[in-house]
Amino acid sequence: MGSKNKIAKCPIRTKQTGYILKSTQNTCIRSGKLLQKKRMGSETSLAKGEKSSMIFSPTKDLCKQYVDKDCLYVQKEISPATPTIQKTRNTINTSVVAKQKHCKKHITAENTKSGLVCLTQDQLQQILMTVNQGNKSISAIENGKEETSQDSLHLNNTSNQPKDENIMGFQKNEALSSVLDENKSTLNKNQETSKQYEQKIAIENVWKPADIFSTLGERERDRSLLEAKKAQWKKELDEQVALKKKEKEASEKWNNPWKKFESDKIVWEKFQTLGQSKTSLSSSNILSQSPSQITVVQADDYPLCRASQILEETVPLERPLSTVKQEQQRKWIEDLNKQIEDDRQRKIEEKITSSKGEEHDRWAMHFDSLKNYPASQSQLSSRSIHNQPEYFCVSPDTQELSDISNVYTPTTGSQVEPSEEEHIAKPVRDMAMANSQKTNFLRSMTALLDPAQIEERDRRRQKQLEHQKAITAQVEEKRRKKQLEEQQRKKEEQEEERRLAREREEMQKQYEEDILKQKQKEEIMTLKTNELFQTMQRAQELAQRLKQEQRIRELAQKGHDTSGLIKNLGGYGLDDVSGKMNTCINSTTSPKKDTAVQTDDLNTGMFTIAESCCGSIIEREILNCSSPEIPAEFNDQFKKDKQELINQDKAANLEKENSWYNDQYEFARTEKKHMKKCPKRPDWNINKPLKRYIPASEKYPKQLQKQREEKKVRRQMELLNLVERNNPGHLSQNRGTSPVLPSPQEAEARFRWHLIRKEEPLKSDSFSKKKKNRSQSPLELVKNRTQQTQTLKNRENLILGDSQTETSPGASEPSHFIPYVRTNEIYHLDPDAPLSRPLTQDLQYQNPHDCDQEQWQLFESDVRDPLLNPNLVKNRDRQQAILKGLSELRQGLLQKQRELETNLMPLAANQEENFNSSF
């Protein structure tokens, strides 16, 4: 407790003596702790009863009650000191003056008689001398815990009383007033020992600060008294150190709230024992044995106990005064009980309010304690007017010392009537209760600061507030900018979405337009190809007819029978082929699209794919065998048209692929968006589906697989034919006896029938392919037809050429057409005839079955054809004749082809112009 007290010395100098009045002021002590300190001091002083300096509690209330200028009696010798007294004391507030005037009315003559003190001149000088000696060496440590004043010392020097009966009187409190009444009889004995009392009082009053008596003069000092005083001072210092230690221990006990009521009971019991021992105690015993027990207890901010130094002889006091004081004491005890209850309730309320938390204005007022708040001003003034310790006060309040000069005016009034005390105490107590509730016992850390430091702190606080405002403004600005950026970004995203939607719509429109254009182009191309096919068909029919007519003429010139050829001129071969081609054209252009649910992209894609594949196959076939009947210029034109078709198909395929990739990319993009919504990505290579093993042969394209299958079947057929031909039974049959040959017409008919029978599977295969590929173009059909007809013509030409060479040297039998069949087998060799020229009569005896078999073998194997394999030819002359006939035939065909080209080209140009003009 002592470490938290900050002591400030406030010197007040007087003009005459120059002595310093020292007083301590506790500045940073909360009122609650100060109250605890007073309790502890009273407890220790009552319990131990140690000798210490006299404790007084001078307050402004004493001044208010007892200042009475009518009762002031001062000797002429001390009159010069009054100006200094007036100078040293502080000015009294108007409220205090008003209360003083109010208190004057209640002071009676009885009270003035009880408050009178008589001193002789010698005793007064002796007291002044001892007081002045004690004031010189007083220290701040002695006054640290016990603040002193002499507010109740009143001097009066009258000429009526004798000089040996001058006594200083102690004005006692109501609690000890009965002690004075009962000690009147014992005061006569103290006259002989007054000098001893003076010495004791001088020793005990060493701690008293400079007051009004320091200006009344100085006398010679006694050395023995000084030495005694020094010894007493040392002793008192030791006692004070021990007292401080005890107070610290007591403060630790007071910090425990559960022990408060026990200590209060102990103090109250001790006070009661003190009141009971009033009959056995004299004033000398009180002064000598227990000076620390003479304390001031205030209730309702009015003195209940006042002690004074008693150096007086008997003064006659009335007996009724003691009964009145006993009644007052009883009332005071009741008030004290009420105060205990009120204080208990107040502490409970304070605990409740402190548990709720401190208010903001109290906190701000705590940190700005030196600023002039009206609440704090009223709080300080109320404290200075009313100090309310609970039971026993060890040291006076801080604010009482600031107005200590108010006590220096001596009064003769002793007490105020109890009714007036209660009347004055109630509003004051209410005010004190309000102030105690308002103050929250906060420790003020800025109480000792300079105003400059407080201003500096204010400036720092203002700067900090400005800095905080700037930071909040920056944060708000950043938030606003972020919000604007977010809005701008949303707008841009919406614009981008709208732009993408517009682009998507434009692309969709463009795609539809491209599809429409593609359909129109395809329709135009189909019309063109149909017209071209019709013109080619008509030209080919005309060429075939002319060729057959020329052949018939040539055969007729050579002497052959051409009746069968004339009959068949418009017969099976050309009519059948042209009819079948017409049916194929009708099937390709048949309105199947109109009779089923259509998907345009799929149909067009299939058409273009089939067309491209068929185009490649047709091109390969044309390269393998180009017919000499179609002119070269027409072939070039056909290749150009085919190349244009292939390029268009490729472009369409690319467009289809692009659109498919776009769709796939859109699907992937949406899939990515869906994946973004999923919090977890799928694991890789987990639970993969098992794939079926696919052999390499099945990985080829469909068209290539078909070609491979066809090649395989063809190879198997060739192998079977070879095995059958090399069979030994077949060879022995050929070596058997030859029957009679039929007529030449029968052989020719049989031979033609065999050719037709052999060509039928080829046609059926081609038509089965056409049925599979319905979307095959008419141009391809034309190529296939022309290829087939060319192969038929070539073989017929070969046969006719052979027969012509055979019949030309021997024209004896012109009416018979005997086909020449080459064979390695020798029948009935004639030694005169050449080996390669068998006799005609031998041929008549040949078996027709063998002839048919040989013809089949001849047409099956191209390897044994003498035109294709010249090494097999043994008769060079005959071969040369055959080749010569073929060259002549070729020259005639070429000439006919040129004539047809010159006739067909202007016709085709006119047809194309008419076709373009129609569109």
Swiss-Prot record:
Region described as Mediates localization to cilia, centrosomes and spindle microtubules and the interaction with PCM1, CEP290, CEP104 and CSPP1: spans on this chain: 570-919
Organism this protein belongs to: Canis lupus familiaris
Predominant subcellular localization, coarse grouping: cytoplasm
Disulfide bonds: none
Subunit description: Homodimer; disulfide-linked. Interacts with CEP290. Interacts with PCM1. Interacts with ARMC9, TOGARAM1, CSPP1 and CEP104. Interacts with CDK5RAP2, CEP152, CEP192, TBG1 and PRC1.
Coiled coil regions, renumbered to chain: 467-558
UniProt protein name: Coiled-coil domain-containing protein 66
Region: Disordered, residue numbers: 145-166, 456-505, 724-744, 762-816
GO biological process: cell division; ciliary transition zone assembly; cilium assembly; establishment of mitotic spindle orientation; microtubule bundle formation; microtubule cytoskeleton organization involved in mitosis; microtubule nucleation; mitotic metaphase chromosome alignment
Record's subcellular location: Cytoplasm, Cytoskeleton, Microtubule organizing center, Centrosome; Cytoplasm, Cytoskeleton, Microtubule organizing center, Centrosome, Centriolar satellite; Cell projection, Cilium; Cytoplasm, Cytoskeleton, Cilium basal body
Superkingdom of origin: Eukaryota
Disease: Defects in CCDC66 are the cause of generalized progressive retinal atrophy (gPRA), characterized by continuous degeneration of photoreceptor cells leading to night blindness and progressive vision loss. A homozygous mutation in the CCDC66 gene resulting in a frameshift and the production of a truncated protein is probably causing the disease.
Biased composition (Polar residues): 150-161
